[in-house]
Swiss-Prot record:
GO biological process, one term: L-histidine biosynthetic process
GO MF annotation: an example: lyase activity
Main subcellular location of this protein, as a coarse class: cytoplasm
Record's keyword terms, sorted: Amino-acid biosynthesis, Cytoplasm, Histidine biosynthesis, Lyase
Phylogenetic lineage: Bacteria, Pseudomonadati, Pseudomonadota, Gammaproteobacteria, Enterobacterales
Localization (cell): Cytoplasm
Residue ranges of the TM segments: none
Catalysed reaction equations from the record: 5-[(5-phospho-1-deoxy-D-ribulos-1-ylimino)methylamino]-1-(5-phospho-beta-D-ribosyl)imidazole-4-carboxamide + L-glutamine = D-erythro-1-(imidazol-4-yl)glycerol 3-phosphate + 5-amino-1-(5-phospho-beta-D-ribosyl)imidazole-4-carboxamide + L-glutamate + H(+)
GO cellular component: cytoplasm
Physiological role: IGPS catalyzes the conversion of PRFAR and glutamine to IGP, AICAR and glutamate. The HisF subunit catalyzes the cyclization activity that produces IGP and AICAR from PRFAR using the ammonia provided by the HisH subunit.
Name of the protein in question: Imidazole glycerol phosphate synthase subunit HisF
Keyword Lyase: yes
Length: 258
């Protein structure tokens, strides 16, 4: 059995790490490179960086900080933000990123997933899915351009359908960003995760809702996710990664101990 992964998420805007609640009202957390080094030193298995306004601004992630991060950490990291072409992805990977993640550009052009997977290998291609539960319809819908609340829109896709499409297109991993839970720290949406797990054949990463160590345990034990991504509990030092991993190991979760 592959070890489960603990993945801090760093949302980047204007060259700094920020964090919001339900993708809104972002506050500045700090500088990118020191935070990345801190999480690597604490025992994170990998890091994810989202340039949250790149797609809505029509630009690609700023590559300068990607190179600086690569110089100070020795764990894998993934970068997302406005990647629309093989050339965009190649440049980010050349600066030291191990994976690239696409989200809104994949919704605009699903063939992008296949082209990137064919060029760089499926193990390098992550698809992020921003999913919102609509109380009125009782369904989960995929949202696009979520980094800019003035441009965020609900797409035609129901989440489970889009999960299956991106796998067919060549996604090597899926990060499920559960918007209702984002930053609230009330736990991951286990109901949704279980539904997605049933149709997801590639590694599945849960994102949105972690507030306690027990929430991570529930995601691994009850929804069988491959990794758990979190931000605010790490940024605000509510949970220490080393202590979290020791707790999970004590609960029988297969995990890499620092």
């Amino acid at each position: 059995m592959l070890a489960k992964r603990i993945i801090p998420c760093l949302d980047v805007r204007d060259g700094q790490v920020v964090k919001g609640v339900q993708f809104r009202n972002h506050e500045i957390i700090g500088d990118i490179v020191p935070l990345a080094k801190r999480y690597a030193d604490e025992g994170a298995d990998e890091l994810v960086f989202y340039d949250i306004t790149a797609s809505s601004d029509g630009r690609v992630v700023d590559k300068s900080w990607v190179a600086r991060v690569a110089e100070v950490i020795d764990i894998p990291f993934c970068v997302a933000g406005g990647i629309r072409s093989i050339d965009d992805a190649a440049k980010i990977l050349s600066f030291g990123a191990d994976k690239i993640s696409i989200n809104s550009p994949a919704l605009a052009d699903p063939t992008l997933i296949t082209r990137l997977a064919d060029r760089f290998g499926v193990q390098c291609i992550v698809v992020g899915i921003d999913t919102w539960f609509d109380d009125a319809t009782g369904k989960y819908h995929v949202n696009q351009y979520t980094g800019d609340e003035n441009r965020t829109r609900v797409t035609q896709w129901e989440t489970l359908d889009w999960v299956q499409v991106v796998q067919q297109r060549g996604a090597g991993e899926i990060v499920l960003n559960m918007m209702n839970q984002d930053g609230v720290r009330n736990g991951y949406d286990l109901t949704q995760l279980k539904k997605v797990r049933d149709v997801c054949r590639v590694p599945l990463i849960a994102s949105g809702g972690a507030g306690t160590m027990e929430h991570f345990l529930e995601a691994f034990r009850d929804a069988d996710v491959d990794g758990a991504l979190a931000a605010s509990v790490f940024h605000k030092q509510i949970i220490n990664i080393g202590e979290l991993k020791a707790y999970l190991a004590g609960q029988g979760v297969e995990i890499r101990i620092c």
